Amino acid sequence: GKSMLKDGQPDLTNADVKGAVEFIKEMYDAGVIAPGAFSMKEQDKVEEFTNGRVGMMIDSLAHVNTIRESNPDLHFSITAFPAEDGYTGERGLPYAAWGIGVAENSTHKAEAWKLVSFLMREDINAQLSSIANAFPGNSKSVPDFVTNDDLFAAAFEIYQSGYPANEFVGLPVAEDLMRSFDEQFQMMLEGDQTVDEMLANAQAAWVEQFK
C-alpha cells in the first residue's frame, strides 16, 4: 500500500520507504538473510529455498512445480506479501508483466487489436494463465490450477484480495532506476553510508532520470 513515488515523481525519502529499508537492514545485520542474497541470480535463490537453506523467499508461481520436482519431500506453503504490523489495507503483489501493443505504423491495426481482444477474452485469458502457471490479466478469468491444486488456489485467493504492484512498469529507463537504487543500497548494507544518505543519493539519481 506504500509507494516510492508521489505524483509520478521520485519520493524515496518518505517515511514508509525509509522504514522498509531500515527493516531489511536490521534483518541483514542480524544475519537472517541468506549470505550473498543481494547478488544471487534468480535461479540461485530458488535453489537455496528448494534445498532447505532458507525458510522463506519471495518468488513466482512459475517455480512451484520446479521446487516440487527438485525436492518432493519439501513441505511449503504460500502466504501474502509481508506488511508492517497493524496494516489493514490491500496489499500490493509484486509482479513481472508482459505487455501487448500495436505499433503506430502498423498496416493492420484493426486486426492487431482484434487479436489483443481475443487474448484478453475471459475464457482465453484463463487458458493462457493456466498454461503459464501465472495470474490472468483479465480480472474475471479463473485459471484451471485454482481448482486442481490447493497451493495455487491459495495463491490465487491472495492475488484476488490484493492488487498487482510494480512501480517500475512504465517508468523511464526502469533498469537504470533499479540499478542506481541497488548500488546505493549495497553501500548502505556495507556500512559506507547511513539509510538517510542512501535514500538521498538514490533520490538524486532518480530525479536526474526523470528530467
Question: How should each PLM-predicted stretch be described?
Answer:
Residues 79, 130-183, 187:
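Long, aromatic- and glycine/proline-rich binding clefts that accommodate carbohydrate-like moieties
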